[in-house]
Amino acid sequence: MKKFLTLLVMLIALVSVASCGPTPQSDEILDPSQIDTSKETVVTFYHANGANLQVVIQDIIDRFEEEMYKQYGVRVTVEQTSQGDYDTLRQTIASSIAAGNQPTVAQTYPDHVSLYLEGEAVKALDAYIEHAEYGLEGEESDSYGFIDRFWAEGSIYDKEGTIYSIPFNKSTEVLFYNKNLFDKYGWEVPATWDDVIEICEAWKQTTEYQNAKNEGKKVGGIGIDSEANFFITLIQQWGGQYTGFDANGKGAYLFDNPQAKAALNWLVQEFNKGNTVTSTHLGTNYCSDAFKAVQLPMTIGSSAGASYNVPTDGSFVTGVAPYPQVAGASEDEKQVIQQGTNITLFECRDKQEELFGWLFMKYLTNYESALDWTLRTAYFPTRKDVAASDEYQKYISQILYDEEGNPQLGENGQPVKEYDAIKEVCVIGLAQSPYFYTSVAFPGSAKARTEGELIIQEILYNQETYSVDKAIADALAALKND
């Protein structure tokens, strides 16, 4: 990472740029009177979305371009380009920064932004957000109408809280459980890790568990999809720290602490009992297939991947519950990871391109666009007004409607509901938003996630070599030498 950043900065110093590049001509924001209506303005938007999501984005782009011509008399063209996946997206943008032809706007994760900041390529948004003509509606104290924890992620890059991104598509992790099994054995939906372990122990006494074992299948009480997320969340829930800033404002790796070690030793204990397993144990990237094959009664995974945890043959009903917490945790102590991306504006020599890049970001995340995006994708609302809207509340109500849009009524005169795990995820997942945490991002913080994942694998699947203490020490040494 250090070698890459050094090369990136050297290349930036050598290159000359034509449009968007890391060295702007000025920090001024164009007044409406300074906008040149005689030229076409092209805004490039890099992202990693698939074909279905690109259709939604293009619909929003078409409306934006029409609106900009009506409002400012400018022919704006937004060119969206999918890089296919997030790793390729990050690498492509990093290379384009070095070459001086970065996009105007991009979909980003926090660790992406921290990398781009090393190249001095990211535009701070504070001046645009507060601008009298182009700024966001609402108040800073209300996160400008965005869900608070989502908005806060845009200002985690320095101690001053400079805003470098705004929320775009968001998800979290939830507990999926086999509702048929829970009903059969009278198990209550777990709220704490103690509850989870109690069900794991009861699971081992069931016919389904024995059948799976007799068939040579790998089993467990609860499956964990993302080992990296689990590493961070356990540390957060046990009251420890994962990353942060030191006294000099420099990024620091902080997971060598008693709380982190207690959390990881608990995990080793429960793994050795056959209660808690990860996708590595199952030999897969995700636990969903094992869950659907009744090798696990519970699994923790992304809300955006809910459909993968629903059996297509209808063999059982998938229940959805909040992420388990430590027993006795207060509301302030509860922790759940927030996932998903933001959008970021890059420094541009052409200040008109930069301005309309910002206006595109603003339009992409306004009420109408955010509502359209939410209703047509599996992602959460990022705005409070979208979450409270009649359209969204109708969508998640699970009430059946007739062709004329009226609710179907049952014999008791009440609306008929049909359980939908995908919509239930929206309700359960977003209800966790007060507990969402965000880890600070800085150059090298992405490597900490990789090391966290490796720690989980070492302490669970290579116990002869790695204790919790050794795994942490080796990880910190690797990060220091990177």
Please give the residue ranges for each predicted region.
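Extracytoplasmic/periplasmic substrate-recognition and gating elements
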Residues: 72-74, 99, 162, 185, ...
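Hinge/lid segment of periplasmic solute-binding proteins
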Residues: 31, 110-172, 213-215, 234-236, ...
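Short, solvent-exposed loop/beta-turn-alpha elements that line the ligand-binding surface or hinge
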Residues: 126-146, 213-214, 220-222, 240-262, ...
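Conserved C-terminal helix/tail region of periplasmic/extracytoplasmic solute-binding proteins
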Residues: 183, 403-482
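Extracytoplasmic/periplasmic solute-binding protein
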Residues: 153-168, 173, 197-252, 268, ...
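Extracytoplasmic "Venus flytrap"/periplasmic binding protein-like
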Residues: 70-149, 180-191, 288-290, 297-298, ...
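Short, low-complexity disordered leader/linker segments with a strong preference
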Residues: 1-42, 473-482
